[in-house]
Curated annotation (Swiss-Prot):
It is found in: Secreted. Disulfide bonds join 2-16, 9-22, 15-40, 24-38, 48-55. GO terms for molecular function: ion channel regulator activity; toxin activity. This is U8-ctenitoxin-Pk1a. The lineage of its organism: Eukaryota, Metazoa, Ecdysozoa, Arthropoda, Chelicerata. Its main location: secreted. Expressed by the venom gland. The presence of a 'disulfide through disulfide knot' structurally defines this protein as a knottin. GO terms for cellular component: extracellular region. No toxic effects on mice at dose levels of 5 ug per mouse. May be toxic to insects. It comes from the Eukaryota. Belongs to the neurotoxin 09 (Tx3-6) family. Keywords: Disulfide bond, Ion channel impairing toxin, Knottin, Neurotoxin, Secreted, Toxin.
Amino acid sequence: ACLARGETCKDDCECCDCDNQCYCPFDWFGGKWHPVGCSCAHANKYFCDHKKEKCKKA
């Protein structure tokens, strides 16, 4: 199962669709591991290719 937009996430690969990224506006620690304030959000079409490559194993 994947996460819809607005749901809390830890990694881009958890979010549904290739134009959905795990965005952390309040993550001052520079990684996706911080659980506070990270949620699936709309990404651009360039991100789509990056995510397909990164999340192939999923």
